Every structure is written in structure tokens, then in C-alpha cells.
Amino acid sequence: MQSKFIKHQGATLHYQIGGTETAPVIVLLHGGFGSIADFAPLLPRLQQHYRVIAIDTRGHGRSTLGTAALTYAQAAEDARQILRHEGVEKYSLFGFSDGGTTAYRLGAADKNIEKIITVGAEWHKKHLDGVRPMFETINLDFVKENLPKQLAAYQAANPEPDAEKWAAALKGMWLDEGASGYPNENIRQIQAPCWRYVAKPISCSPLMIGRH
């Protein structure tokens, strides 16, 4: 995998690209407090069959946080910018957790997506009803106590580490109930085949989303 960087809306975004150049493109989007490194076990197999583009979300891995607020809408726009830069027209998405939520936003807005797979990803702000008290406690102390490995990896990899801002940015994204947050009912606009894995795989096609 080759590392590349582009500047976009105040941030330097890091991504890696590899695999078979003429193969279908798959874009990997990691979760909160994670990075491209989370996909390391999958990359050897994926590169045999796909042109793989793995993106460090702004503020994560080797991507700087920049000046724009970290939101699901911003993460989707960052991914679009990278894909435009690489000349990618059609692609599939694999998103874990926050990466899956970003994938839903991309799928709802963009019609050039071939397939979507998400793992442990939320799509509606109503899920906040059960987790808001925990999200509201997130700060640097929370990260130090509960996510020491992720914190150490971030501090080692990020060119502009600021763990307090990092935690605050994610807290803001997770609690965002506005237009820049969860896709909510817009998920019905997804036209690509979509598989959502929680405890078991569930279709997230427009016809199925209301049943789960």
C-alpha cells in the first residue's frame, strides 16, 4: 500500500492505495479513535481482488484535524475529494462504526457506488437515546482510561497530535443531531446493494430499512 496525502478544507488527509490497478475499487473507512491500521489483517486478501483505497479520517491516523468541524458530512466530503483526486468514478464501500455511518451518507447522496458493507454502524440519531449519557462524558481522561492503545497509536502516528481536541471532535460528531450528522431517513435513498452487520447481517436496502 502506497501512502498519499492531499490538502482539503484546512486538513492534510492521509490515505493509502494499493492492489490490482485495473480491479474494482473498494474504499475502507475506519471507526472513531481508529485508523487505517485497523484494516491491516484484511489488506493482503483485499489487494488480490480490488484496487484498495483506505482513508485516515481527519484527525485520525496520519490525517490532521484541520479547521473544519469533524462531522459525518465532512468525512464523506473528504472521501469524495480523495476519490476525485484519484480519478475514481465507481467504487464500493466497507465502513466500520463511524466509517459505516459515513458510508451511509455517501450512499444516500452519490449514485456511482456499487456496493456498501457496514459493521456496527449507526444510521439514525434516535440511537443517541440510549448512549447520550456516555457520549457526554467523553474527554481526554475517558480516552486515557478506556482507550490507552488507541491513544498511544494516535500520538505516535499523527503529525499534529492533540488528544484533548481529538476526543472533543469525536464527541461533537457523535452527538450531532443536525443536518451534518447521521443520515437518518435519507438512508432510504441508497440505491446500491447494502449489507449492514450488527449481531447478524441485515439488508439496509430502502425496502428493508423500516423493519429493523
Give the ranges of each region predicted by the language model.
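Conserved HGGG/HGGXW glycine-rich cap/lid loop of the alpha/beta-hydrolase fold
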Residues: 9-62
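Conserved alpha/beta-hydrolase "nucleophile elbow" surrounding the catalytic nucleophile
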Residues: 30-32, 91, 95-97
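Residue in the alpha/beta-hydrolase core beta-strand immediately N-terminal to the catalytic nucleophile
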Residues: 56, 92, 114-117
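Conserved acidic catalytic loop of the alpha/beta-hydrolase fold
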Residues: 73-91
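Flexible "cap/lid" loop of the alpha/beta hydrolase fold
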Residues: 101-149
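Active-site nucleophile elbow and catalytic-triad environment of alpha/beta-hydrolase enzymes
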Residues: 169-186
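Short beta-strand/loop motif that positions the catalytic acidic residue
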Residues: 190, 196-198, 202
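Conserved alpha/beta-hydrolase "acid-adjacent" motif
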Residues: 203-209
